[in-house]
Swiss-Prot record:
Protein name: Photosystem I P700 chlorophyll a apoprotein A2
Species of origin: Arabis hirsuta
Binding site for phylloquinone: W671
Subcellular localization: Plastid, Chloroplast thylakoid membrane
Higher taxonomy: Eukaryota, Viridiplantae, Streptophyta, Embryophyta, Tracheophyta
Reported function: PsaA and PsaB bind P700, the primary electron donor of photosystem I (PSI), as well as the electron acceptors A0, A1 and FX. PSI is a plastocyanin-ferredoxin oxidoreductase, converting photonic excitation into a charge separation, which transfers an electron from the donor P700 chlorophyll pair to the spectroscopically characterized acceptors A0, A1, FX, FA and FB in turn. Oxidized P700 is reduced on the lumenal side of the thylakoid membrane by plastocyanin.
Length: 734
């Protein structure tokens, strides 16, 4: 018999039903479960797949550059970044006739195009790219890197170049490479680019390979570096009247601590950012050399962890046993990496709008909204993934003997206390927040809005004031105009920072009131409940009072038969599955809040948010319904407009989302009956019955159907909101 899919599992390959296909796809990346897998092959497969991942990323970014250079309007956009709409790429085959062609011909293009809401134009402009030729060069370079990555992946699967397991488990060398090599050297290289290319470009000087060695980035060259007069590099910064991209009002400083924003571009000063990256580079270059590699000096991670036994015995044996536990578990390492990456992605979302790094991006409102929403959703998926792999670690890799009485074992020992506290926090937040919202709803419905319960977030306002926001009148710390810190801030450190906080043209320290207080607690409810489900799933993954032998059933099991009542829905996978719904729900509230507050800010009617956000009907009517009018009117008897594509995506997103429930609400028996009826009809229908299949069609397993349902729910949810967000924002602000 010829080898059938899946080749990595002979047991599955011999399955006579369609289960072979679905289980094959589901376990394709679960290398640990494949036939003949060894620890060495497992590590090598994962290592090689990283090169493939890099190749795809480089190819994708190359494509962005290539299409903008070929079909975009980068050179035109540079002339007037605030009024020309940046083009992502052309639309090859516009359907729906002449009105569609006219609706999508914009941004100075000759034919129908898509507008870019990704911020790449602003990014490329900020880092010193100026012509289509620059973009083509970048695209070719990334294509070369992509090919190099593919070759690297292939090479490291060849017998001569396969790394050994000991190489993968050398923690100190990996820290050396990642901290110094990846973070340190790349930050230093980026500082170099900013100083040698981007800052001159922002001052109207075009530095490329042909004049790179002739143009001094600073009039004094390297002199101040070697004589220790580093402050010279900060003297004569760009003035507040500087026109970005020209020499008008420009200075000569390359590394500054100005603080605040460039008045024209409303983005952070390039010289501040160069300084920041230089500091990061030095920090990481030092950090990467603190661990013991080939030279017998520096810290040993294992020794550090073994020594970490807190005094007083309150944490038992402290970190003993953790080194081997983490170093031998890929799932633990992946969980830690995903948790870190999830947090950093959410931080990117928060900082990209509040401290914009790219010239003119703060005035491109649709891009701001799209980037915030994009990064928050990505962060949600990555964070839930961290807990999923944490749970798999407990099931597959955790060794109780190795971790006796250390911090990890003690987490498991008092899991009831952890879970019940999280549960209490979630219940408290949920009932109180909903109670306030519903009370306010009823008061408005009865025509007595003055009877609403409105709570000023005084603690948060006090914290904002302490950081320098004066409008609340707290007169404390940095908002106290006669304090020493305030005066030092005017001269010694970041003189532009306090000005930026108290300007109303940016998103720093937005003024908050009772509506913010309520939605903040609604979001806190979502975060705590999501965390509760994920933490409970991981801590109960090995077993619970109800099902002490749970770990023997693996990560995802539907139930343990009818004999043990109540074992359905308690696998670690079920916890992850439920948590993703809560995660999407929570990020929904986060993005609704961010978007509505900013729409009213940009339109200059902040009072709409302040007055309507204190009761649920206000959110439904004045945010969702009011802003979806553009979508519902994307096409009408008078033809099409440029929002039509978002209107269809809005409908299509709802369709995909609703399809999810088909899989979430009806399970195997229903589908099995339906499949058998359809197969019966197929076999008795002339012509159709010429098509045969070898695999007997069977319904998806309960767990698989849930996955398919969850995937449709998630994708539909995000498609729907993306269309709503982009259409409602671009419809208002162009």
């Amino acid at each position: 018999m010829a080898l059938r899919f899946p080749r990595f599992s002979q047991g599955l390959a011999q399955d006579p039903t369609t289960r072979r296909i679905w289980f094959g796809i589901a376990t394709a990346h679960d290398f640990e479960s494949h036939d003949d897998i060894t620890e060495e092959r497992l590590y090598q497969n994962i290592f090689a797949s990283h090169f493939g991942q890099l190749a795809i990323i480089f190819l994708w970014t190359s494509g962005n550059l290539f299409h903008v250079a070929w079909q975009g309007n980068f050179e035109t956009w540079i002339q007037d970044p605030l009024h020309v709409r940046p083009i992502a790429h052309a639309i090859w085959d516009p359907h729906f006739g002449q009105p569609a062609v006219e609706a999508f011909t914009r941004g100075g293009a000759l034919g129908p195009v898509n507008i870019a809401y990704s911020g790449v134009y602003q990014w490329w402009y900020t880092i010193g790219l100026r012509t289509n030729e620059d973009l083509y060069t970048g695209a070719l370079f990334l294509l070369f890197l992509s090919a190099l990555s593919l070759i690297g992946g292939w090479l490291h699967l060849q017998p001569k170049w396969k790394p050994r397991v000991s190489w993968f488990k050398n923690a100190e060398s990996r820290l050396n490479h990642h901290l110094s090599g990846l973070f340190g050297v790349s930050s230093l290289a980026w500082t170099g680019h900013l100083v040698h290319v981007a800052i001159p470009a922002s001052r109207g000087e075009y530095v490329r390979w042909n004049n790179f060695l002739n143009v001094l980035p600073h009039p004094q060259g390297l002199g101040p570096l070697f004589t220790g007069q580093w402050n010279l590099y900060a003297q004569n910064p760009d003035s507040s009247s500087h026109l970005f991209g020209t020499s008008q009002g420009s200075g000569t400083a390359i590394l500054t601590l100005l603080g605040g924003f460039h008045p024209q571009t409303q983005s952070l000063w390039l010289t501040d950012m160069a300084h920041h990256h230089l500091a990061i580079a030095i920090l990481f270059l030092i950090a990467g050399h603190m661990y013991r590699t080939n030279f017998g000096i520096g810290h040993s991670i294992k020794d550090l962890l073994e020594a970490h036994i807190p005094p007083g015995g309150r944490l038992g044996r402290g970190h003993k046993g953790l080194y081997d536990t983490i170093n031998n578990s890929i799932h633990f390492q992946l969980g830690l990496a995903l948790a870190s990456l999830g947090v950093i992605t959410s931080l990117v979302a928060q900082h990209m709008y509040s401290l914009p790094a790219y010239a003119f991006i703060a005035q491109d409102f649709t891009t701001q909204a799209a980037l915030y929403t994009h990064h928050q959703y990505i962060a949600g998926f990555i964070m839930t993934g961290a807990f999923a792999h944490g749970a798999i670690f407990f099931i597959r890799d955790y060794n109780p003997e190795q971790n006796e009485d250390n911090v990890l074992a003690r987490m498991l020992d008092h899991k009831e206390a952890i879970i019940s506290h999280l549960s209490w926090a979630s219940l408290f937040l949920g009932f109180h927040t909903l109670g306030l919202y519903v009370h306010n709803d009823v008061m408005l419905a009865f025509g007595t809005p003055e009877k609403q319960i409105l709570i000023e977030p005084i603690f948060a306002q006090w914290i904002q004031s302490a950081h320098g926001k004066t409008s609340y009148g707290f007169d404390v710390l940095l908002s106290s105009t006669n304090g020493p810190a305030f005066n030092a801030g005017r001269s010694i450190w970041l003189p532009g920072w306090l000005n930026a906080i108290n300007e109303n043209s940016n998103s720093l320290f937005l003024t908050i009131g009772p509506g913010d207080f309520l939605v903040h607690h609604a979001i806190a409810l979502g975060l705590h409940t999501t965390t509760l489900i994920l933490v409970k799933g991981a801590l109960d993954a090995r077993g619970s009072k109800l099902m002490p032998d749970k770990k023997d059933f693996g990560y995802s099991f539907p139930c343990d038969g009818p004999g043990r009542g109540g074992t359905c829905d308690i696998s670690a996978w079920d916890a992850f599955y439920l948590a993703v719904f809560w995660m999407l729900n929570t990020i929904g509230w986060v993005t609704f809040y961010w978007h509505w507050k900013h729409i009213t800010l940009w339109q200059g009617n902040v009072s709409q948010f302040n007055e309507s956000s204190t009761y649920l009907m206000g959110w439904l009517r004045d945010y969702l319904w009011l802003n979806s009018s553009q979508l519902i009117n994307g096409y009408n008897p008078f033809g099409m407009n440029s929002l039509s594509v978002w209107a269809w995506m809005f409908l299509f997103g709802h369709l995909v989302w609703a399809t999810g429930f088909m899989f979430l609400i009806s399970w195997r028996g229903y589908w099995q009956e339906l499949i058998e009826t359809l197969a019966w009809a197929h076999e008795r229908t002339p012509l159709a019955n010429l098509i045969r299949w070898k695999d007997k069609p069977v319904a998806l397993s309960i767990v698989q159907a849930r996955l398919v349902g969850l995937a449709h729910f998630s994708v539909g949810y995000i498609f729907t909101y993306a269309a709503f967000l982009i259409a409602s924002t671009s419809g208002k602000f162009g």
